[in-house]
Amino acid sequence: MVDPVAALCNYNVLEVIFSYLELDDLSHCSQVCKSWNLFLNDENSDVWRWHCLNKLPKEALKSDLLSSVSTYKTKLRAYFHAWSPNDCSRNVYIKPNGFTLHRNPVAQSTDAARGKIGFRHGRHAWEVIWEGPLGTVAVIGISTKEAVLQCHGYVALLGSDDQSWGWNLVENHLLHNGDMQGSYPLLNNAPKYQVGERIRIILDCDDNTLSFEKNYEFLGVAFRGLPDKKLYPTVSAVYGNTEVSMVYLGTPMDG
């Protein structure tokens, strides 16, 4: 029979030790034995709380931006999957909250940004919120690392080449390889995007498809036959001072 005092002591010791480890080390620790795996599977434990509070900007934790990721571990994961400050147009910067990009008011320029982490396998979802005016063109979707992130003029940059796939929220058109691939969603008089609405990008690398949800309503498959390449969440914008936030949700829930 396990001594409850000893068990509590062991729990507290693990809690202290794991709080000082790096996240990569925690991943390795979860594979050491069943008890450690169970311990780290508690996504709201004090260990994940400590790492979350110490690594995430306070501005993000105080806002409702992370309301779709309910545990400390998933909030932490979302932070490491947010916009990349090193993979965006020179006219874009990432705000101190770590999740929101800001496009500077530069004339005659279209500017894009990619997420830090892309995927080649599995199913993944990101929540995107356009928090400023759309302007004449506002595109969300995915791209490879080869897709261009800045160009002259006001154009639908995402979807302008064979390395990117996008949905233009202004005109409700799908774009790839410089061509309009049809209207989306396939509804009569489909409502246009309203600033602040939550859109989910759903990438299925196993089925090679890209889909979207708006306000938790599935809009259907947008693209099929995606290549066997690492794909990243991406947006392109033209409006000065517009802002776009993105939160990685993990594996999308069916239904």
From Swiss-Prot:
Pathway: Protein modification; protein ubiquitination. GO terms for biological process: negative regulation of gene expression; negative regulation of synaptic assembly at neuromuscular junction; neuromuscular synaptic transmission; positive regulation of protein catabolic process; proteasome-mediated ubiquitin-dependent protein catabolic process; protein ubiquitination; synapse assembly involved in innervation. It is found in: Synapse. Its main location: other. One of its GO terms (cellular component) is nucleus. It comes from the Eukaryota. Residues 61-253 form the B30.2/SPRY domain. Residues 3-51 form the F-box domain. Pfam families: F-box-like, SPRY. InterPro entries: B30.2/SPRY (IPR001870), B30.2/SPRY_sf (IPR043136), ConA-like_dom_sf (IPR013320), F-box-like_dom_sf (IPR036047), F-box_dom (IPR001810), FBXO45-Fsn/SPSB_families (IPR050672), SPRY_dom (IPR003877), SPRY_FBXO45 (IPR035784). CDD domains: SPRY_Fbox. Keywords: Neurogenesis, Synapse, Ubl conjugation pathway. Component of an E3 ubiquitin ligase complex composed of hiw and Fsn. Belongs to the FBXO45/Fsn family. Required in the presynaptic motoneuron to down-regulate the levels of wnd and restrain synaptic terminal growth at the neuromuscular junction (NMJ). This is F-box/SPRY domain-containing protein 1.
